[in-house]
Amino acid sequence: QFDAETMTLHHDKHHATYVANANAALEKHPEIGENLKELLADVTKIPADIRQALINNGGGHLNHALFWELLSPEKQEITADVAQAIDEAFGSFDAFKEQFTAAATGRFGSGWAWLVVNKEGQLEITSTANQDTPISEGKKPILAL
């Protein structure tokens, strides 16, 4: 469970700053477009003078946007399809929770724990530092903490 102060800090300060800084970087190179998912999927296509700013701030925006999208005031049960995929990938839902918790608590400093679909189409748990996003590794994030 999250407290209001932490959520307000992340929404009104952190996320808002990532959006403002990503927009400022993108304004320097309108020719590259504004699709952060596409840009972060191949960071070598981002001009060098704004690359790190977009990795940090574009990643921060995408990471937080997914996090907000996944939040719900009500407990949600997972669908049968998702439960089956988790069982196949991790052995059980309890094993998934243990591995996901380990990814989250094992991250030193700031970062994220992720449930992703990897390049092979399989579920995988991973962790990224700071505002790095698994999109840059060719993975599709589906759960973030």
Swiss-Prot record:
Amino acids binding Mn(2+): H10, H64
Entry annotated with the keyword Iron: yes
Name of this chain's protein: Superoxide dismutase [Mn/Fe]
A Gene Ontology cellular-component term: cytoplasm
Catalytic reaction equation(s): 2 superoxide + 2 H(+) = H2O2 + O2
Record note on cofactor: Binds 1 Mn(2+) or Fe(3+) ion per subunit.
Role: Destroys superoxide anion radicals which are normally produced within the cells and which are toxic to biological systems. Catalyzes the dismutation of superoxide anion radicals into O2 and H2O2 by successive reduction and oxidation of the transition metal ion at the active site.
Residues the entry annotates as binding Fe(3+): H10, H64
Cofactor: Mn(2+); Fe(3+)
Family: Belongs to the iron/manganese superoxide dismutase family.
Pfam families recorded: Sod_Fe_C, Sod_Fe_N
